[in-house]
């Protein structure tokens, strides 16, 4: 699923202006600029590629291992009741920044009236099953 869209020369994820919460050989983690919950964090590969599907196997593995570390940090800091993890890939998938990234989103009891379905809610009529 290689995307042809190119970020402007100053990619906001290639040169993040936020505190790095955690890092690994192939990835960085920092707070989302527009968090949907307290602690919402992005795991971003160091190499500029459009989507997580464009990552080399070692980069992909490293990103998800860093996401696990981030989950542990967020659990200790925020004591959430659950998590969502995911990546928006392609325009139809909701991607708005054309540098691959993984969202790690702490979830709290009561933050939405009907949490069942989780990420399935991206298509509301398909959330219930």
Identify the meaning behind each predicted range.
Residues 1-129:
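HIT superfamily nucleotide-processing domains
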């Amino acid at each position: 699923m290689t995307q042809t869209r190119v970020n402007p020369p100053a990619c906001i994820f290639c040169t993040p202006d936020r505190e790095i919460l955690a890092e690994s050989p192939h990835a960085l983690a920092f707070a989302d600029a527009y968090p949907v919950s307290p602690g919402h964090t992005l795991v971003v590969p160091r190499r500029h590629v459009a989507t997580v599907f464009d990552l080399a196997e070692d980069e992909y593995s490293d990103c998800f291992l860093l996401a696990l570390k981030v989950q542990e940090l967020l659990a200790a800091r925020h004591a959430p009741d659950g998590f969502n993890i995911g990546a928006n890939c392609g325009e139809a998938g909701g991607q708005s920044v054309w540098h691959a990234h993984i969202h790690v989103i702490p979830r709290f009891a009561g933050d939405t009236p009907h949490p069942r379905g989780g990420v399935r809610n991206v298509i509301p009529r398909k959330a219930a099953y």
